[in-house]
Structures are given as C-alpha cells and as structure tokens.
C-alpha cells in the first residue's frame, strides 16, 4: 500500500509538471514545449547558452508562468479544502460553498464592483486591483464566522446546524447579489458576470506572491488532520471517545478551508466543481484514508485546474472562455458517472 501510494504521488506530480509545461505553451501565441522547458531551466541556472525568441520569453515571463502558477496554487487550495470539508461534515456532496464561503466572497466582491466609486473610492485609489481580492477574502471570512457562531451552542458546534446556517447564508448572499446585479450598469454587470464565472486571466507575479502565503498554510496544515478526519468518519461521539478534541478540530478545519478557498476566490473568482469532484476521484484511486487523500487532492486539484485553464484558453482561441464554465462542463459528466456507479455507497 505504501509503495502504491508513493507511485500515485509520483505519477500525479510528473503529470502536473508536464501539463504545466504544455499549458505555458498554449494560447493565442503558441510556444514550443522545448522553449518553455529551456526558459524554466534557465531560471534555475541551467541551459544558459540556449537562445529563446524574446517574444516567447516575454509572453512566458509576463503572462503564462504567473497564470499557470496561480492555477496550481488555487487548484491545490480548492482540492484539499473540498476534501477536508467533506471529511468534517461526513458528507460526500459537501463542498466549501455549502457553508457560505463562496457566497460570502461573491457578495463582497459584487458590493465592491457596484459601489466602488461611491463608497470605496479612497480604498480603490489605495489598493487598486487588490481591493476586490481583499474584499472577497473578507467576505469569505465573515460568512464562515457567522456560520460557525450560529452553529455554536453551550460551547460546542453542531454539524447539522452549521449546514443549515450555511444554506441560510447562501440564500441571503444570493438574494443580495441578485439585487446588486439588478441595479448594476452594463460595465459593472460584465465585470460581475466574468468574475462570478471565474478566471485566471489577471494573474501576475505580484498576485501569485500575495496569495501564496494564505494558500500554503492550509495546504501544509490540513494533511496533518488526516488521522482526525478518519476518526470523524465514525461519528463525532466516537471521535470524542478516542480522545480527540472534536470542537477544536472542526474549528481548525473550517478556518483553514476558509483561508484557502477565500484566498482562491479573491484572485480567481468562483470556480466550481474542483472542491466537489477532486475528493471523489482521489478516493477511487487511493481509498478513503484522509492521511493520503488530503495531500493527493491538493496535487490533483492543481492538475485539474491547470488542464481546465489550458482548455479555456485554446478551445476557441484567441477568445478565452471563463474557467468556471469549463470546470462545470468537464466535471458534471464525470461526477454524474461517479454518482450512478457508486450511488449505493454514497447513501448518507
């Protein structure tokens, strides 16, 4: 089993590296895979004598490399956060959006887009593009905090109440988002629509560096909770009898998932299906041990988003499709197949 898991990790990493290289070469400007590898190798001090056209080098440095790196870290955050949320709620259909994280981020982003000039003018001048990112991140955090506080009773948080609170927050955020969309002008409506459908088009080196710390923390810490999430599969009472601090674990998982998803939504908009689909595929490959499923979900999430981004840039090039549309179109048939194939196992 150890060798099998090690082999799976190795294959996933190799495929991710190769897919990233091909993705950097795809788009309106086609760049040979060998030139991509040479540029990447030169950045670490190798192949110093090889010459790559300046046009290719500029496209890679300014656009493609930051975009692919952002896709990798966002995909990793969405994949591992989805796995952790499913584990803590013991619900194979759960995802971060279920507890209001995505809805809170969306609402705050729409508020900023619609009211930026009238209310957030000074902040917009100070933060520029990052105002939307900070706002979305704050919205995700506020929504998660509300859900967690509503679900607490006598110092404990109830999973069923948390799910119901998440549904309520989603409904409220959806209603307010719809209201703001209704009063938005044409340009604001276009911005809202593009952001709600998700995109990595705005990736820069600064964006990658700004969001990486918020994503690295959950990606590194959530796998350490794999053993505890395995115990949660038996039920909260049984996990408590095994000596686990159930409320502390639930709080930590929700906080870390919120950090990862909130940061991802802040820089890429709403990208669906990664957090829902990735855990199912990894469990089919590696089994249900969260000690292995969590890190593998991060790698596979990065791979899925990298491939989806490559498709959205090339399928109707030079026009670029929203990445959320691609993940939904690719993910829905696979997810339905999994549901039909294993529907007896997925009965809650």
Language model regions located:
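Alpha-helical transmembrane segments in inner-membrane proteins
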Residues: 1-348
């Amino acid at each position: 089993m150890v060798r099998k898991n090690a082999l799976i990790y190795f294959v996933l990493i190799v495929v991710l590296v190769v897919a990233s290289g091909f993705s950097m070469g795809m788009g309106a400007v086609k760049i040979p895979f060998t030139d991509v590898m040479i540029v990447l190798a030169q950045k670490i001090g190798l192949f110093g004598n090889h010459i790559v056209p300046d046009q290719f080098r500029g496209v890679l440095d300014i656009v493609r490399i930051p975009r692919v790196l952002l896709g990798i870290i966002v995909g990793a955050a969405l994949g591992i956060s989805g796995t952790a949320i499913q584990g803590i709620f013991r619900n194979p259909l759960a995802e971060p959006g279920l507890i209001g994280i995505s809805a809170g981020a969306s609402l705050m982003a729409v508020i900023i887009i619609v009211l930026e000039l009238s209310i957030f003018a000074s902040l917009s001048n100070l933060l520029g593009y990052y105002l939307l990112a900070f706002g979305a991140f704050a919205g995700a955090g506020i929504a998660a905090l509300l859900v967690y506080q509503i679900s607490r009773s006598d110092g404990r948080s109830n999973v069923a109440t948390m799910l119901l609170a998440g549904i309520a927050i989603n409904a409220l955020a959806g209603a307010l988002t719809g209201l703001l969309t209704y009063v938005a002008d044409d340009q604001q409506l276009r911005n809202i629509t593009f952001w709600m459908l998700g995109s990595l088009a705005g990736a820069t080196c600064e964006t990658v560096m700004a969001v990486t710390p918020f994503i690295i923390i959950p990606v590194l810490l959530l796998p350490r909770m794999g053993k505890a999430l395995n115990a949660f599969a038996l039920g909260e009472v049984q996990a408590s009898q095994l000596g686990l601090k159930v409320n502390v674990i639930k709080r930590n998982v929700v906080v870390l998932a919120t950090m990862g998803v909130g940061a991802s939504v802040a820089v890429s908009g709403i990208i669906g299906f990664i957090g829902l689909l990735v855990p199912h595929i990894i469990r089919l490959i590696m089994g249900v041990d969260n000690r292995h499923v969590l890190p593998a979900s991060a790698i596979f999430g990065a791979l899925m988003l990298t491939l989806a981004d490559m498709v959205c840039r090339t399928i109707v090039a030079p026009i670029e499709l929203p990445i959320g549309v691609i993940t939904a179109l690719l993910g829905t048939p696979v997810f339905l197949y999994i549901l039909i194939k294993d529907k007896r196992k997925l009965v809650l």
